[in-house]
Amino acid sequence: RAAPKSGIYQAVFDRLPAPCQRHPLLPALLLRTLRLNCLTDAYADLWAECFDPSFTSDSWTIPDRATTPLGDVGPTWTSQTPLRRAVDRRQALVEIDALVALMLGITADQLCTVYRTQFAVLYGYDHDQYFYDAHGRLVPNQVLKVRRKKGEAITETERTATTYRYDLPFHTYDRELDMHIAYVEFERRLETRGTDS
């Protein structure tokens, strides 16, 4: 959004804001980014090179939401390293947004304003299209169409798509609230680090 072009060249890249490389929250940002992107063993070397022992003590800002413990990783990439459940991937994205905002001096309210005004399509999907089942999987549209007609009376057969049965209840999540929660928690963690030094 900062540079809406088909190609971003070095001069444009150099003007983009970036967090300080020595910021105390950088390992938290790196962990979430790596777990979103290191999807196959082709990324094993990158994972090993970037691994920080502090990853193992990191945790989600909304711990009861995610299905995968964030800090349950080691220095060697395994098939368990990447975040695969939709709700975990969503939470990582929310926390990355909050971390970068905090690191760049953007308030939580400003972050939410950017989300509403610059990412209107995502805002709409978050409120109307992205439903997660009881196991954190994104529910397909064909299942949601039946649910909209039948509500909680939807049958098990109607909740089954491909090889997955999507278990009730289905949830949407409030990205703005989650970004605020993440932001406040990362502020608290940053202040705690400052008093521990």
Task: Name each model-derived stretch.
Residues 1-197:
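S-adenosyl-L-methionine
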